[in-house]
Each structure stands twice: as structure tokens, then as C-alpha cells.
Amino acid sequence: MSRVAKAPVAIPAGVEVKLNGQEVTVKGSKGELTRVLNSAVVIAQEENNLTFGPKEGVTNAWAQAGTARALVNNMVVGVTEGFTKKLTLKGVGYRAAMKGNAVGLTLGFSHPVEHALPEGIKAECPSQTEIVITGCDKQVVGQVAADIRSYRAPEPYKGKGVRYADENVRTKEAKKK
């Protein structure tokens, strides 16, 4: 059994947490996040800690409590520090540039690709082959990075495409005659 739910979530100074039934709202310097948690989870606030536990008589309540604890912890980290995903472009002529509230990509198609950014997400291009995505919601930051990567995922022969900065693309050997 996982013991994630047994550890409380510490609420740092400058972070405000509101509990309204199963709805948790976390407000900090980077923004505000709200999430409705599963009904099988009991949430309690004790001074600067949030504790999670299972509701009696529910089969997978401990699993749901662990999930809820991880989600709320990510919310607290997001509103204090934020989350960042870095993408790199590899390939001849592959470029990225900011166009207002969208990322403009040149990825070898007959047309340029523009990816509009959702609210609360910021992106910057330190160079033509790098994109840095930041925001306070871990799920949305990861989804935007995955959407941009999906336009041209790294291919296995030369490794050309959009990849995460920490991603290791295994390349294959070309077919021999």
C-alpha cells in the first residue's frame, strides 16, 4: 500500500488555502488554483498543514487520498515556485519564435505552425531552437509542452523534431544493403 496520503502537505508562508467541502482553493504569489477532490477523501486543515485520509467504507479510499495529496501538493508548489518545461528543436530550418500570445514554429511543413497559449501559461524563446514554458498548473504546463512536441515528435533515424530538453532519443541504424 502506498503511504503518500499519510504525509501532510505543509502550507508555506504567503500561501492561502480555502476548503469548501471537497473544493480546495490555493492562492499564492504566482496565481490561484482550484480543484474539486474525490468524495472518498477527507481533508482537514490543522494550522499550517493539510492532512488527507480515507472516508470509511469506500474501497479505494487510500488510493484516492494519496492522489488528492499529490494534487494539492503540486498546487502549493505551483503557486509558490511554478513549473517549467523546456523544449528543444533539432533539425535543419526548425525554428521557434514568440508571436504575441502564441508560439510560432517552423518545422519543415509547407506552412508555419502557431500554437496559442492557454490562460496562465507563459512561454519564451531564449534562442531559435529553445522554448521554455512556465505556469503554476503542472498539468496544463505539461499538456502545452506535449501539444507542441506532437507537431513534430523526434524521429528515430536522425533525431529531428521537437523534444523535451531532458529527453534522450534513441536513434536507429539505417538499413544496410
Swiss-Prot record:
UniProt keywords, alphabetically: Ribonucleoprotein, Ribosomal protein, RNA-binding, rRNA-binding
What SUPFAM superfamilies is this protein classified in? Answer: Ribosomal protein L6
Q: Name one Pfam family in it.
A: Ribosomal_L6
Record InterPro entries: Ribosomal_uL6-like, Ribosomal_uL6-like_a/b-dom_sf, Ribosomal_uL6_a/b-dom, Ribosomal_uL6_bac-type, Ribosomal_uL6_CS
Q: Which GO terms describe its molecular function?
A: rRNA binding; structural constituent of ribosome
**Alphabetical GO biological process terms:** cytoplasmic translation
**Which Gene Ontology terms of cellular component type are present?**
cytosolic large ribosomal subunit
Q: What does this protein do?
A: This protein binds to the 23S rRNA, and is important in its secondary structure. It is located near the subunit interface in the base of the L7/L12 stalk, and near the tRNA binding site of the peptidyltransferase center.
Q: Which PANTHER family match?
A: 60S/50S RIBOSOMAL PROTEIN L6/L9, LARGE RIBOSOMAL SUBUNIT PROTEIN UL6M
HAMAP family referenced in this protein's UniProt entry, alphabetically: Ribosomal_uL6_B (MF_01365_B)
| Recorded family membership | Belongs to the universal ribosomal protein uL6 family.
Instruction: Quote the subunit structure annotation.
Output: Part of the 50S ribosomal subunit.
Q: What is this protein called?
A: Large ribosomal subunit protein uL6
Species annotation: Vibrio atlanticus (strain LGP32)
